Amino acid sequence: KFSIKKKDDAAAKVGEDAQNAAAIKAHPLLSRLQLGGGLSTVGYASVRDTAAINKIIYSAVAKRLLPSDLRLLWSAQPADNVKMKNIYELHALKVTTTTGRAPLEGDVITDAKDEFDQMGSPVVSMKMNTEGARKWAQMTKANVGKAIAIVLDGVVYSAPRVNGEIDGGNSQISGNFTIEMTKDLANTLKSGRMPAPARIVQEEVVGPTLGAQSIQMGIISFVVAFVLLMVYMVMMYNIVPGMMANLALLVNVFFTLGILTSFQAALTLPGLAGMVLSLGTAVDANVLIYERIKEELRSGKGMKQAVAAGYGNAFSAIFDSNLTSLITGVILLTTGTGPIRGFATTWIIGIIVSFFTAVFLTRLVYDYKLNHDKWMHCKFDTAVSHNLMQGKKYKFMSMYKTTFTVAIVAAVVFIGSFFVRGLSKSIDFTGGRNYVVQFENPVEPEQIRTVLGDAFVNADGSKATTGAIAIGTDGKTIRVSTNYMIESNSPTVDDEAETILYNALKKANLVSQKSVEAFKNPDVRQGGSIISSTKVGPSVAKDITMGAIYSVLFALIAIFLYILIRFRNVAFSVGSTVALAFDALTVIGFYSLLWGLVPFSLEIDQTFIGAILTVVGYSINDKVVVFDRIRENLKLHPKGDRQQLFNASINETLARTINTSTSTLIVLLCIFILGGDSIRSFSFAMILGVVFGTLSSIFIASPMAYIVLGRKIKEEPAEEAAVAEVK
């Protein structure tokens, strides 16, 4: 009997589940939304069901069936009159204006604060200006006994009942509030003190497929760069030192990811680029230490003494170069926008972590092994790197007139190109809209430019500026840019621009979507669609332009002051700042000369400004290392011939310069080739910066410091001139 009853119960439960499933399928809204509530509240739902309900109430069918003046919005906070947690209210609001906007907006509120009423309950008091007070009196008089909703960002913060006409502009909002809720509501109301209603001045929409592809490309470039760096370190510094450097790289990655996870930071492509570049920074520290250890071993010291001296002598160069890069990273973080801040965050974390892993972590391992008489005969070179650039006596200082002449001619050419060809400015600096459109079949950008040439016409009858460039190598992805009606505040302009784009491409048989809604949907790829879009208003474009100029100037000034403080000589500050300015000019100049001639975009945007600042931060590394060696030799030989001393210092650091530049170029080439189109322009600027930044350290920064410092002093005795060149 028991078994029969158990089977009957199970069958009944299965039947009940089937009935529930059928009911949910037949009435999906009623199964998730509990009706009732009174006043503006039409129902309650769990937070986990809101997404499913939104698909129903915001669907095309709902738009046709529901009244046109009805708006359904969720509450900002969970309801407090239900027993379950995370239950939100659904409010039904009536649109009372022809424009669809609220009859009263936040600009009429002059003050709002959280207080307590006579019963000691938390309330919010607000005060309006004269015009707001007049309209508020009219609204409250016409809606006694009804609710008036306070809405921000599409959610209802409060919907209090109107008990009577309120004049004078002073009102009190009461309800079942907590102190935290009244503080939040007061701050929300005070945010309405802006001089004009808020409108979208900058927007970026990325389709999920495009975003996934970008992240995948970033991860691939990161993994490939990491593996190549590991191979390079072993190839240049042998098994044990190479693997120790690789261990430091691995710990660097884990620490960086751990810190990002603790901050709950989202993984973005610029953030991945920052991580990849931080690998180059980590390698630089290890290269400095290993080159110093090799010098100490060549001087006849034992392994223990050589390792201790190598770490000790390399510390100042590592500290100064990392700190100058950190200064640039902080400037990027404080002055940049979303993508640049993401890059700066991971780069800053990488700089700090690489300093810890290179200077302290690997030192602990070496000390432990050497104290136990292990690794006493460890080799820090291989057949490839043995005596690399050792004993060279290049006379760099005697070439400064020639190199300065070449630099001046190049600067004139770059500046001339600015006036003749200009720069390919993105909407970040001009204002406008970008649409990345994926077509079914390959299409030429020139064809798109022809099709859209007369499509976008501004309200005054003038033609909007329109452009198109290819994205990727398949020929199916085109980025369309236009400044159509960018000055307009109308909320319908965005839809108008997308409709114009769709109609023009549809007429030319370039897309086959049956509606503009399908064309705008990034998930509907068949027939062609917009997979991402960006909008920048003219005010934001002006702010970005000025912010870019200020950030670069501020970076140069900050580095000038830091070098002055650390090296206590204006000659090094002048040399480094002039060279850094030339590095920035060179990168910008090549972008002016090459845009339109290379098969990838060279637009000047916020990412490019981030690249310029990164070039400044990276380039100063090499200059600091060279200057640190010059400073060291000046202390050892204060009366030595300075031309010979400068030449010797540069020659002594050539091996480090070559290894660091090569390892960084490996990383950047991985980003450039594998990182995707969205980061290619950034990596190209960095490649130019590394190449010309390295050259400027030798041929501009050092000679400039040499000239300012003074060339002729009394030569020291021959026995003290060990570092001098033999003429």
Go through the PLM ranges and name each one:
Residues M389-N441:
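Transmembrane helices with small-residue packing motifs
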Residues G169-Q172, E180-V227, I500, A504, ...:
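Juxtamembrane "pre-transmembrane" interface segments
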Residues G242-Q264, M275-A282, F343-A358, S573-W595, ...:
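Small-residue-enriched core segments of transmembrane alpha-helices in multipass membrane transport
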Residues G280-S321, D367-W375, S592, V598-T660, ...:
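Cytosolic juxtamembrane regions of multi-pass inner-membrane proteins
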